[in-house]
A protein has these predicted regions:
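Peripheral, non-transmembrane regulatory/ligand-interaction domains of membrane transport proteins
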Residues: 1-219, 223-226, 230-240, 299, ...
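Hydrophobic alpha-helical transmembrane segments and their immediately adjacent juxtamembrane loops
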Residues: 232-339
């Protein structure tokens, strides 16, 4: 559902809401400046600003497209800026596009086309009311306050990502077998999206700080430099966090390889023991099969040697012990020769 709020700001910093677009535009001609805040507007609603405030039709098209990258474009009557708001909740990164138009005596914000039910600028009216000094600088001061608010929201997203990276590291170290590596892949994708957005937003602030925009007064440039510093810091954080993700992936792979090696060694040890047992009993099985131990006379002809059975068992025991000793010596020789 679309919403719109219109405000007029006096030179002293006082502001009040108005309902009619023509009335608020007429009020701006008497002094002060205006803020037109649109949430999910229809295209026709924005097209009325083309004639009334000199907004370029292509900029209106960009406002309706939710797949734009941050940028700044200069026109004769205004400067068009696309900035992003970050919202990170339930392990999902939402990037909401904020469209801003700044002119000599107006600021227009358009948001909500890619934010579901989120309202990125819902708190701005309350924030502006508590910061009258900044908005006395005109549209430049209001633009700075909005961009500064959006940058603060980015910090919240980075805090949550840092906590998730620490949690992932603890899980990998505690029990790598039960860790899901897809978590790291998800975090890496989020960082890639953040990096892409921050890269373009830094370029916007560079152009603002070197006074490329004629509608931003020089007195407010110091405030925009502060925003640039924050964006540069966040950009460096994305690089740092990406390196941490890579390190955690390598750590996880290394620990998994260690577990597989340990499991393989245990399996080899079990097979070795079974092989030893089979090797010891193999000649005994052969002798027992030939001797036919189920009959007393199989090996004694017609004579019934009652001692033949115990002697045969004793011989088998001696052979078994001899086999065991021989096999152990062979294993030891193999170990020494392998060193």
């Amino acid at each position: 559902m679309s919403e719109r709020k219109f405000f007029h700001f006096s030179k002293t910093g006082l502001f009040y809401g108005m309902n009619n677009l023509d009335d608020v535009i007429a009020e701006s001609k008497e002094g002060g400046y205006i803020w037109l805040n649109y949430y999910k507007p229809e295209k026709d609603e924005l097209m009325t600003l083309v004639e009334k405030l000199g907004i370029h039709p292509l900029s209106v098209e960009d406002c309706m497209d939710d797949n734009q990258v941050p940028k700044i474009e200069h026109f004769p009557d205004n400067t068009f800026i696309i900035f992003n708001a970050f919202n990170y909740a339930q392990k999902i990164l939402h990037i909401d596009e904020i469209n801003l138009f700044i002119g000599k005596n107006f600021l227009i914000t358009v948001s909500g086309h890619n934010s579901d039910e989120r309202k990125p600028l819902a708190e701005m009216e309350k924030i502006i009311a508590g910061d009258p000094g900044n908005i006395r600088l005109g549209p430049s001061g209001l633009l700075h306050r909005i961009m500064d608010f959006l940058v603060d929201q980015k910090f919240n997203a980075f805090e949550v990502l840092e906590e998730e990276l620490e949690e992932a590291e603890d899980k990998i170290l505690d029990n790598p077998a039960f860790f899901e590596p897809t978590e790291l892949i998800r975090i890496r994708k989020c960082l890639q999206s953040l990096r892409k957005s921050l890269f373009h937003e830094r370029e916007i602030l560079v152009k603002i700080c070197r006074l490329d925009c004629p509608f931003i007064i020089e007195k407010s440039i110091a405030h925009f430099r502060d925003i640039y510093d924050h964006l540069a810091k966040f950009f460096e954080l994305t690089e740092t966090y990406r390196e941490i993700v890579t390190s955690l992936m390598e750590l996880y792979t290394s620990l998994q390889n260690n577990l597989m090696t340990k499991s393989a060694n245990e399996t080899n040890a079990s097979v070795r023991r079974l092989t030893l047992i089979a090797t010891v009993f193999m000649p005994l099985t052969l002798i027992a099969s030939i001797g036919g131990m189920s009959e007393w006379t199989m090996m004694t002809s017609d004579l019934s040697w009652k001692v033949s059975y115990p002697l045969f068992i004793l011989a088998m025991a001696i052979i078994a012990v001899a086999n065991y000793i021989i096999i152990r010596r062979i294993e030891k020789k193999g170990q020494f020769s392998g060193r």
